[in-house]
């Protein structure tokens, strides 16, 4: 048959083995003599069968030679993995055993990466993740890529460890140090949804995250769900793929130490927030204090030293060592401790620091209450020009108001408030701040001034002669009003007295007090121009004041006054 003469049958290039049926017990000479003829008849074409029969083994048992399906052992790269020495023939210390294990594992990974034997068997593979594609539509998470990346990361960690433990260690020739090592630390937002882990990790103005990066030397980024606000996310596929994962911190560094240090810092923040209440979290309090300092609203009371003892943790008015009496003083303007009213920073501009009693006693001022109420009242007064106070009364001065005794003299009458009571001044008893020249003595109670007894040295109503109710007219002891009393008689010698001598009651001169004369040896000086009648010694009295009726006639008992002398 023609097909038997062909050296290659079909597309199979592997030569066929010798035939197993028939001719095995025949003479060997026939086969030997037929071999050259057949070879020569085919014009040098190699036959599919073996031309030389192997010699039988010494024990007479024929064995079939098994061929390796991968080729020769010298060319088989995978077969070299089985030749790695794993038997330990000497007594090694623990450090030597660890170094040998590192070296053996690094060599094994290097050979797998060299022959591209990275994908394990079907039974050892894990379920494949969903496919991911880059901007060009190429899949980035293929099976070969994922397993190669895993082996490269493992070899990088082992090489870093071997370079520290094994002296003069040289990594494999095909080893390339990666630019960065990254690792993910997941945040338990599902277990603690009420805790703001992102705010604690980032901090005010990102200072907490920057501090952790500076301390560890690694780059820390927050990725995953919830890391980017809605409407501010990027549209690229790589960023969109990170948004599908859970919230995590992506740590990137060039060495493993930096990554571990950054992981420790991130774990510390997460564990502290999850185990300690928010009010007792020191990190949260420091962040709030730092944010207040950045905004300019910080009042650092905790770290401020006490002005009394110098210790930190309390103010001077709460100091246990009471050595400074100023710390116990309470300001009556703002209600705070540690300063007087004259030094109060909340005192209104232009107001007096004294808070005298005066007549009015303790009248409520506008400034009483907390600082917010005082500022609001002051603002309303400045805007409206006279806003009512908290008690509905017209606004008054906080200190040195219209009812504060001697401070009332610099206040205009129309600026004075209503009187503190409806009782007449002469009916008020027990006024401590009266002078000795007021309206009568304390023991007279509610008696009017004209009914009060005259005291020595007083110069009120009825004190001087010629006035209303003068003692000479007997009106000091009567209870009638001066306008209901009879006119007193004129004093003798009224022509030389000052005032209206002919009209009693109009300021007659005091008895025994005449007009002063000229000094010895001098004449009476002339009166000033235009005022001849108002000068002492003037002969003619001034005309009576105009009125509705004529002046009363003089009493009939008394003689008429003498005519004026020329």
UniProtKB/Swiss-Prot annotation:
CDD domains: KH-I_BBP (cd02395). GO terms for cellular component: commitment complex; cytosol; nucleus; U2-type prespliceosome. Residues 1-77, 341-367, 382-566 are annotated as: Disordered. Residues 341-352, 394-413, 429-441 have a biased composition (Basic and acidic residues). Residues 186-266 form the KH domain. Gene3D superfamilies: 6.10.140.1790, K Homology domain, type 1, Zinc finger, CCHC-type. Residues 473-486, 494-513 have a biased composition (Low complexity). Residues 517-531, 540-566 have a biased composition (Pro residues). It is found in: Nucleus. Keywords: Metal-binding, mRNA processing, mRNA splicing, Nucleus, Repeat, RNA-binding, Spliceosome, Zinc, Zinc-finger. Residues 355-364, 457-472 have a biased composition (Gly residues). A zinc finger (CCHC-type) spans 304-321, 329-346. Residues 1-14 have a biased composition (Polar residues). The keyword RNA-binding applies. Disulfide bonds: none annotated. It comes from the Eukaryota. It holds the Pfam family SF1-HH. GO terms for biological process: mRNA cis splicing, via spliceosome; regulation of mRNA splicing, via spliceosome. GO terms for molecular function: mRNA binding; zinc ion binding. The keyword Zinc applies. Belongs to the BBP/SF1 family. Necessary for the splicing of pre-mRNA. Has a role in the recognition of the branch site (5'-UACUAAC-3'), the pyrimidine tract and the 3'-splice site at the 3'-end of introns. This is Branchpoint-bridging protein. It comes from Aspergillus fumigatus (strain ATCC MYA-4609 / CBS 101355 / FGSC A1100 / Af293) (Neosartorya fumigata). The gene is bbp.
């Amino acid at each position: 048959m023609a097909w038997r003469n062909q050296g290659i049958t079909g597309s199979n290039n592997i030569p066929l083995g010798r035939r197993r049926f028939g001719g095995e017990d025949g003479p060997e000479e026939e086969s030997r003599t037929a071999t050259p003829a057949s070879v020569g008849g085919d014009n040098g074409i190699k036959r599919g069968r073996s031309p030389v029969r192997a010699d039988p083994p010494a024990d007479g048992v024929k064995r079939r030679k098994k061929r390796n399906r991968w080729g020769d052992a010298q060319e088989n790269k995978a077969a070299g993995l089985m030749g790695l020495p794993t038997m330990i023939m000497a007594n090694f210390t623990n450090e030597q055993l660890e170094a040998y294990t590192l070296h053996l594992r690094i060599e094994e990974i290097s050979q797998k990466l060299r022959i591209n034997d990275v994908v394990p068997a079907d039974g050892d593979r894990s379920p494949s993740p969903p496919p991911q594609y880059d901007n060009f539509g190429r899949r980035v998470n293929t099976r070969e890529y994922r397993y190669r990346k895993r082996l490269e990361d493992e070899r990088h960690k082992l090489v870093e460890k071997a370079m520290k433990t094994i002296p003069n260690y040289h990594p494999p020739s095909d080893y390339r140090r990666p630019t960065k090592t990254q690792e993910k630390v997941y945040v338990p937002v599902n277990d603690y949804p009420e805790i703001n882990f992102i705010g604690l990790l980032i901090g005010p103005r990102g200072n907490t995250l920057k501090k952790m990066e500076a301390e560890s030397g690694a780059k820390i980024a927050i990725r995953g769900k919830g890391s980017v606000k809605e409407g501010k996310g990027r549209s690229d596929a790589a960023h969109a793929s990170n948004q599908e994962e859970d919230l995590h911190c992506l740590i990137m560094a060039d060495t493993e130490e930096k990554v571990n240090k950054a992981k420790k810092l991130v774990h510390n923040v997460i564990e502290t927030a999850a185990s300690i209440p928010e009010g007792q979290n020191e990190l949260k309090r420091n962040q709030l204090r730092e944010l207040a300092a950045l905004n300019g609203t910080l009042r650092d009371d905790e770290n401020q030293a006490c002005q009394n003892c110098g210790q930190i943790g309390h103010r001077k008015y709460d100091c246990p060592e009471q050595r400074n009496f100023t710390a116990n003083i309470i300001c009556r303007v703002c209600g705070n401790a540690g300063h007087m009213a004259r030094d109060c920073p909340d005192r209104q501009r232009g107001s007096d620091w004294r808070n005298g009693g005066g007549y009015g006693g303790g009248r409520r001022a506008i400034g009483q209450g907390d600082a917010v109420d005082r500022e609001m009242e002051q603002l309303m007064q400045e805007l409206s020009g006279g806003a009512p106070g908290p008690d509905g009364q017209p606004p008054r001065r906080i200190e040195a108001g219209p009812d504060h005794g001697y401070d009332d003299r610099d206040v205009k009458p129309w600026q004075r408030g209503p009187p503190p009571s409806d009782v007449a001044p002469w009916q008020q008893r027990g006024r401590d701040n009266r002078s000795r020249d007021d309206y009568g003595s304390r023991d007279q109670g509610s008696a009017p001034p004209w009914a009060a007894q005259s005291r020595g040295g007083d110069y009120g109503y009825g004190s001087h002669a010629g006035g209303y109710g003068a003692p000479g007219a007997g009106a000091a002891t009567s209870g009638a009003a001066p306008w209901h009393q009879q006119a007193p008689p004129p004093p003798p010698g009224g022509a030389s007295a000052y005032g209206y001598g002919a009209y009693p009651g109009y300021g007659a001169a005091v008895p025994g007090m005449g007009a002063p004369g000229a000094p010895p040896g001098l004449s009476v000086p002339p009166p000033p121009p235009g005022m001849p009648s108002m000068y002492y010694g003037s002969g003619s009295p001034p005309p009576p004041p105009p009125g509705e009726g004529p002046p009363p006639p003089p009493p009939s008992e008394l003689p008429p006054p003498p005519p004026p002398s020329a």
